[in-house]
């Protein structure tokens, strides 16, 4: 007999012994209890009998209840380990409720819209780190120190070249030093080109992008001037080094502006915890497009800030035409005179076609504006955003824009008549809450401090005179300014001269006066001033606040309210209900939702557009004038007037108005 058969026989005997035994509940509990056995205390027979009666009196056991003392012995049988149970799992396909409800045409999305500020902030930070912050650190590694040193050295080259040119024109250079003078000027021109080598490389890179910019034209100018300089060494003629060095200096200055602008914009974006957008929406008020506010996206800025502006595109077209004109005049000079004269004419024509200030006409106005926008945490979304914020627009204003939280305070309360003061407060709060506006929270706090209640208002209406009215418990109630109550026939006691106060009248009798203090903040005042300074901007009051009348705003902020609009209540309600559409164009992003940031974005954009367009137009005109002058002198053969001194003076003459135009954005 094997060992396995012996083990099977022993297990069978043990199983039969277990089946033959009867187990009580107490035995089972004792078997599985961890507590040590305690000494059994003698109990009287009466208590045992009472427990026996209570046990017999237990309620009937329901079908879903199992009594341990009634366990069937068959349940205690052990299941062989080698027995395998098969369990079939049926896969349940989820029901597409939305599709089912759509077929029945009775689906209603009952799931609530959950606002997850943390997830939005996390997504915003992820985009900011991948875009603006990464770009900011790349620019920080490049820095602006080398550019500043190059600009200073280039200015020194300009001064030395201009001084040497002046000595030559005054006849203070001896003939035996002429070759040294010419070689020195030619060497200075090469040094200037070395200082602006990155600008020249940018001009070549622009060709690969299918752009012919001023830097590309500067590369051609360098090549032609170098060839002309070789002829100058043979003819002992001074090359136009001063004019070329001045152009290189201004090109370096333009690159410095572009880098500081981008660093400032990226710094503003990377510090954002929330972005607010200013977008242009068509047909907002009286046919004017409106500048509405909404949630901003990082892509609104990153996708547009590097795109060429309208003036820059015009500059590229002009640069190509200027090159063709210069080549044509050079060929004409070579045909009419000789090869040396042809290169001389081409060189001076290229210099005259692009005045030095042309290189900063688009960058410097934005650099000046960016310093102010950076302080108020605002960025413009490229030239597309500048165009969106320009033109004749309507700018909506609300109570929170003029008086942010905490700017309006209760200065005092005075009651008149025999009516209960708590009733007066309750009536006033009920009416103001129905009307809405910036005074709701203030009066609700006053009502809560008095443990008051709100009453239902009937026949509520707004009055154009500066107040609201309605019926509460069958009594007519008026709330508004002092002039409003006087116009409504309410008698005001003599001696009351509080203008900034809310007056309450019940049944034609003055019952209360709530004096208010409106704090004028510097940022709000500057924002209102810049908005009202432009005729093309119409500031529209959209809030239902009877205190914000035209006379009150004029006296409080000292602005020209004739450029503001105070529409009827029905129109204000329609304006408040308007939202951004798919046709809205984002013009600017700001991290602070205050009036100063939004107002300067709008007015700054239109100043920038004016400065860039005016500057580009003026420099194109100056270049055309220079090309025409070179053509006339070439035809007349007056090569004696094409001197380096005259070319440098020509650059300086157009530098003054061009520089002044770039200051336009300081007037914002």
Give each language-model segment a name.
Residues 188-199, 228-231, 244-273, 280-394, ...:
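Hydrophobic alpha-helical transmembrane segments
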Residues 145-202, 631-647:
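Core alpha-helical transmembrane segments of integral membrane proteins
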Residues 417-465:
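ATP-binding catalytic core of ATPases
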Residues 1-106:
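Intrinsically disordered, low-complexity acidic segments enriched in Asp/Glu and Pro
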Residues 286-289, 472-475, 506-645:
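Conserved ATP-binding TGD loop and adjacent catalytic N/P-domain core of P-type ATPases
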């Amino acid at each position: 007999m094997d060992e396995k058969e012996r083990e099977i026989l022993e297990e069978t005997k043990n199983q039969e012994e277990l089946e033959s035994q009867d187990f009580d509940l107490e035995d089972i509990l004792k078997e599985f209890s961890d507590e040590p056995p305690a000494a059994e205390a003698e109990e009287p027979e009466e208590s045992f009998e009472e427990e026996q009666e209570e046990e017999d009196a237990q309620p009937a056991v329901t079908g879903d209840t199992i009594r341990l003392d009634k366990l069937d012995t068959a349940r205690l049988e052990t299941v062989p380990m080698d027995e395998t149970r098969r369990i079939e799992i049926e896969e349940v396909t989820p029901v597409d409720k939305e599709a089912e409800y759509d077929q029945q045409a009775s689906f209603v999305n009952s799931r609530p819209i959950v606002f997850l500020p943390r997830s939005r902030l996390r997504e915003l930070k992820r985009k900011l780190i991948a875009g603006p912050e990464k770009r900011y650190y790349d620019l920080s590694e490049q820095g602006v120190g080398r550019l500043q040193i190059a600009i200073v050295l280039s200015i020194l080259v300009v001064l030395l070249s201009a001084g040497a040119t002046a000595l030559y024109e005054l006849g203070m250079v001896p003939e035996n030093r002429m070759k040294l003078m010419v070689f020195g000027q030619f060497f200075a021109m090469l040094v200037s080109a070395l200082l602006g080598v990155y600008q020249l490389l940018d001009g070549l890179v622009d060709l690969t992008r299918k752009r012919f910019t001023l830097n590309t034209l500067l590369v051609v100018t360098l090549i032609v001037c170098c060839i002309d300089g070789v002829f100058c060494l043979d003819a002992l003629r001074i090359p136009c080094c001063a004019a070329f060095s001045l152009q290189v200096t201004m090109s370096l200055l333009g690159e410095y502006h572009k880098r500081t602008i981008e660093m400032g914009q990226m710094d503003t974006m990377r510090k954002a915890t929330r972005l607010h957008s200013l977008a242009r929406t068509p047909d907002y008020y009286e046919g004017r497009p409106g500048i509405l506010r909404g949630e901003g996206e990082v892509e609104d800025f990153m996708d547009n800030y590097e795109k060429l502006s309208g003036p820059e595109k015009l500059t590229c077209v002009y640069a190509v035409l200027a090159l063709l004109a210069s080549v044509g005049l050079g060929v004409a000079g070579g045909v009419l005179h000789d090869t040396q004269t042809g290169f001389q004419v081409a060189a001076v024509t290229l210099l005259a076609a692009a005045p030095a200030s042309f290189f900063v006409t688009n960058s410097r106005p934005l650099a000046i504006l960016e310093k102010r926008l950076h302080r108020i945490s605002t960025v413009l979304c490229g030239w597309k955003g500048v165009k969106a914020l320009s033109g004749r627009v309507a700018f909506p204003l609300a109570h929170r824009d003029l008086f942010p939280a905490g700017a309006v305070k209760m200065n005092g309360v005075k009651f008149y008549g025999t009516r209960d003061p708590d009733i007066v407060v309750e009536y006033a709060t009920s009416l103001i809450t129905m009307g809405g506006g910036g005074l709701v929270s203030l009066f609700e706090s006053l009502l809560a401090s008095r443990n008051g209640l709100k009453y239902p208002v009937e026949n509520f209406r707004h009055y154009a005179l500066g107040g609201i009215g309605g019926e509460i418990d069958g009594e007519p109630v008026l709330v508004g300014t002092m002039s409003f109550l006087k116009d409504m026939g309410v008698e005001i006691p003599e001696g009351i001269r509080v203008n900034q106060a809310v007056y309450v009248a019940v049944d034609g009798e003055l019952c209360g006066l709530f004096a208010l203090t409106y704090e004028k903040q510097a940022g709000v005042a500057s924002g209102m001033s810049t908005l009202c300074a432009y005729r093309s901007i119409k500031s529209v009051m959209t809030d239902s606040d009877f205190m914000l009348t035209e006379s009150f705003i004029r006296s409080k902020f000292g602005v020209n309210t004739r450029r503001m609009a105070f529409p009827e209540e029905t129109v204000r309600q329609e304006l408040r209900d308007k939202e951004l559409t798919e046709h809205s164009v984002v013009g600017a992003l700001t991290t602070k939702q205050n009036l100063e940031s939004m107002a300067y974005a709008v007015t700054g954009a239109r100043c920038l557009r004016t400065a860039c367009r005016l500057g580009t137009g003026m420099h194109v005109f100056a270049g055309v004038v220079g090309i025409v002058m070179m053509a006339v002198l070439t035809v007349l053969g007056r090569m004696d007037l094409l001197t380096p001194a005259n070319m440098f003076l020509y650059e300086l003459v157009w530098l003054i108005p061009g520089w002044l135009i770039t200051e336009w954005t300081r007037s914002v």
